[in-house]
Amino acid sequence: MSGLKEYNGCYCESEYEYAFIGFLEAEGWEYSSGNNISRVTKRDILIANDFKKFVADTNLDLTEDEVTQIYDSVRLVGAETDFATLHKVYNWMVNGIQFTPQDGIARMIPLIDFKKDSNKNIFRVVNQFTVEYTNNGQKENRRPDVLLFVNGMPLCVIELKNPADANATIYDAWEQINIRYWRDIPHLLHYCPLACISDGVKTRLGTVRTPYEHFYAWRRVNDGDAVSTLPFEETETMIKGVYAPERFLEIFRDYIYFQDSIYDSDEV
């Protein structure tokens, strides 16, 4: 769908966005514009069709109404704090959500299939996904640059800055996610533990609660590879090393850690 396009010897932000998406497509992600995704309102965060298809395809005994009940349980999640809600949803994503179907026997319903070589998961990269919120009684919106959905749930938010603008830094991208998005659209970040920030030269991975200084550069795709040093090479290395679908799920499941609440820390 997209590739690196040169723009007067450099890259503008919109073309970098589509180049980034093109790299993800090459790794196996399916591209959709947020403008073409069916939602009841722009406050809706989940992609209902993908979520329900995965649950139905992996639980053939469930009725359509039961699948909708599971969807509503995840869609209407609530907890005492933003951090607690994020932790609760992450636990569902990794371990499944408990549900009692019409036979009366409670069981765990997986929301992601972590089995090696699974072909059940739906990997979707989305841009132009407008998220609505209310500010002093007025409807406003935010539009993250790129979101990565697995089975209709946005597991990673990606914020990109113009590689041609020396004043646009990855710190600005970090502030956009970890400050402004938490302030305005926390209902998106409740489902979205991972965060990536990039300006083409520097690309870093963290979580939506990670301090800026702890965001991590992915230097190699595999052990023994040469360290990436060229512009855009670091981006490609991050995408191949982190976002190849099977590897992405492994990182998502095994490398996200929530601090114990007794230490009064909301870091992930």
For each of these PLM feature ranges, what is it?
Residues 2-268:
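ATP-dependent helicase/translocase motor core
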